[in-house]
């Protein structure tokens, strides 16, 4: 994919130091998808980019190069970084890691970029991050072509009955079932997932269960670092409450 002629809307997903003064950036861009950039001298004391090239800060970037790693040529922050703290910050880190693990390099996904921006905006304002996370996971699955019909029984084609139970079969959909296990969902839960509107705790839990099932093949067996960090954060807080 050719380098852009002008500035592109982007976010930093992850950054790591390179040599004494540079950074390697994993970027999610509106028009070019995921790309890897080297920012030369970004860590030096004289660099005015040191504070700007951070996750969750809306950026305008320009780069050059044809290889797997491009060179950052220009960077301008659009605004201050989104105000993410506590559990919402860890949730946003999870979203970034999910994109980095699941999306291929240099595949344009402007629609998903807008879903990502919406998710970050929601997380910056939400008391409970779970609905925003589930909506983004579902948007990510849809962007990757993971097509599931939540509104019709895969066995009969009939509309989903809110009161009935359905069992998920990968690459087929939901089939009416009397069994109850990790792969079964109530009809009202499937309708809520389809609409991405979760009115009850049970619907939200069902959405989380489904996205974990659907994302597992893409993530493999390697644990998510953001999830481990979140667990580590919760343990000290739980211990302090017990005291």
From Swiss-Prot:
Pfam families the record matches: RecO_C, RecO_N
Record-level GO cellular component terms: bacterial nucleoid
Nucleus in keyword set: no
Gene3D superfamilies, sorted: Nucleic acid-binding proteins, Recombination protein O, C-terminal domain
Entry-linked InterPro entries: ARFGAP/RecO, DNA_rep/recomb_RecO_N, NA-bd_OB-fold, RecO, RecO_C
Keywords, alphabetical: DNA damage, DNA recombination, DNA repair
Recorded family membership: Belongs to the RecO family.
Function, as annotated: Involved in DNA repair and RecF pathway recombination.
Protein name as annotated: DNA repair protein RecO
Species per Swiss-Prot/TrEMBL record: Vibrio vulnificus (strain CMCP6)
């Amino acid at each position: 994919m050719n380098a852009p002629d002008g500035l592109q809307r982007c976010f930093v997903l992850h950054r790591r130091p390179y040599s004494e003064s540079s950074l390697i950036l994993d970027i999610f861009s509106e028009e070019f998808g995921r790309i890897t950039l080297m920012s030369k001298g970004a860590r030096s004391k004289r660099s005015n980019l040191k504070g700007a090239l951070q996750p969750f800060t809306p950026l305008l970037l320009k780069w050059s190069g044809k290889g797997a790693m491009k060179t950052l040529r220009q960077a301008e922050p659009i605004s201050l970084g989104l105000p993410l703290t506590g559990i919402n910050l860890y949730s946003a880190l999870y979203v970034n890691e999910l994109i980095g693990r699941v999306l291929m390099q240099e595949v344009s996904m402007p629609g998903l970029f807008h879903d990502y921006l919406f998710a970050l905006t929601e997380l910056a304002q939400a008391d409970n991050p779970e609905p925003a996370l589930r909506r983004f996971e579902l948007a990510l699955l849809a962007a990757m072509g993971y097509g599931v019909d939540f509104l019709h029984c895969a066995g009969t084609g009939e509309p989903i009955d809110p009161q009935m139970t359905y069992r998920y079969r990968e690459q087929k959909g939901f089939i009416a079932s009397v069994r109850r296990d990790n792969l079964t969902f109530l009809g009202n839960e499937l309708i809520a997932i389809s609409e991405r509107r979760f009115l009850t705790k049970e619907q939200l839990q069902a959405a989380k269960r489904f996205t974990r099932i659907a994302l597992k093949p893409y993530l493999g067996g390697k644990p998510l670092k953001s999830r481990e960090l979140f667990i580590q954060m919760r343990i000290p807080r739980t211990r302090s409450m017990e005291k």
